[in-house]
């Protein structure tokens, strides 16, 4: 099928001007995820904040009740017993100076990064590498911790980090098209709840302004914000 015809087909039945209840929006997106691979279901939340101001930054981490469907590679900066704990918990890459050297050389073989507090002076050297990728360990979201086993299991088990972008948007994957619709709805509501709880002191007016759901290759469907709470 030609790309133009394919796009026309998957867009049929979606009113671009309408705000759909969350459960209906998810159903529409799932029905149109027709690629040969299991598409990721993504959510975009527009917030009434200006992240250029420190008191309007929004970030956090949420454990999705039904996981993400992704295989997440976890890297841990730790030594001694904590390194052993990380390996036992299923971390894919564990190290100290050796791991720093790997990352500096451009070998980043992980998707999420965790560090013990004593490692941060060393890990701090990697700010220019990990920072732009949103992978720098941060105590505010539980990735600088002595509980490395818990952090590794959380990252592997469906925890999602979120951070508002320059345009005031949070984007996150919340599951796969193969998930049951009700499980995707539960995940989206869990994300929205976490975003609400992370509302900064400097936010004024309507906080969650717009919500949209889409699949990797599909069109976005606008959601009535009141139905995600």
Swiss-Prot record:
GO BP terms in the entry: regulation of translation; translation
Family assignment from sequence similarity: Belongs to the universal ribosomal protein uL1 family.
CDD domains hit by this protein: Ribosomal_L1
Keywords noted in UniProt: Repressor, Ribonucleoprotein, Ribosomal protein, RNA-binding, rRNA-binding, Translation regulation, tRNA-binding
Described function: Binds directly to 23S rRNA. The L1 stalk is quite mobile in the ribosome, and is involved in E site tRNA release.
A Gene Ontology term for the protein's cellular component: cytosolic large ribosomal subunit
UniProt keyword Ribosomal protein, yes or no: yes
The gene coding this protein: rplA
Gene Ontology MF terms in the entry: rRNA binding; structural constituent of ribosome; tRNA binding
Organism: Rhodopseudomonas palustris (strain ATCC BAA-98 / CGA009)
Name used for this protein in its record: Large ribosomal subunit protein uL1
Subunit structure: Part of the 50S ribosomal subunit.
InterPro entries assigned to the protein according to its UniProt record, in alphabetical order: Ribosom_uL1_bac-type, Ribosomal_uL1, Ribosomal_uL1-like, Ribosomal_uL1/biogenesis, Ribosomal_uL1_3-a/b-sand, Ribosomal_uL1_CS
Name of a matching Pfam family: Ribosomal_L1
């Amino acid at each position: 099928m030609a790309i133009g015809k394919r796009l026309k087909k998957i867009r049929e039945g979606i009113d671009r001007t309408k705000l759909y209840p969350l459960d209906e929006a998810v159903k529409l997106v799932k029905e149109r995820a027709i690629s040969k691979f299991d598409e990721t279901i993504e959510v975009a939340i527009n917030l009434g904040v200006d992240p250029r101001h420190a008191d309007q930054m929004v970030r956090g981490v949420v454990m999705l009740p039904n996981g993400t469907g992704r295989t997440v590679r976890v890297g841990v900066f730790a030594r001694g017993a904590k390194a052993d704990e990380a390996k036992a918990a299923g971390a894919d890459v564990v190290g100290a100076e050796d791991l720093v050297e790997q990352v500096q050389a451009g070998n980043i073989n992980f998707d999420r990064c965790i560090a013990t507090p004593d490692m941060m002076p060393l890990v701090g050297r990697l700010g220019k590498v990990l920072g732009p990728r949103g992978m720098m360990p941060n105590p505010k979201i539980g990735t600088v911790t002595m509980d490395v086993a818990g952090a590794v299991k959380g990252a592997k088990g469906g925890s999602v980090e979120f951070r508002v972008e320059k345009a005031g948007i949070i984007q996150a994957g919340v599951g796969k098209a193969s998930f049951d619709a009700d499980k995707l709805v539960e995940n989206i509501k869990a994300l929205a709840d976490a975003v609400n709880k992370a509302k900064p002191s400097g936010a004024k007016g309507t906080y969650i302004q717009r919500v949209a759901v889409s699949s990797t290759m599909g069109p976005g469907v606008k959601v009535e914000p009141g139905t995600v709470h």
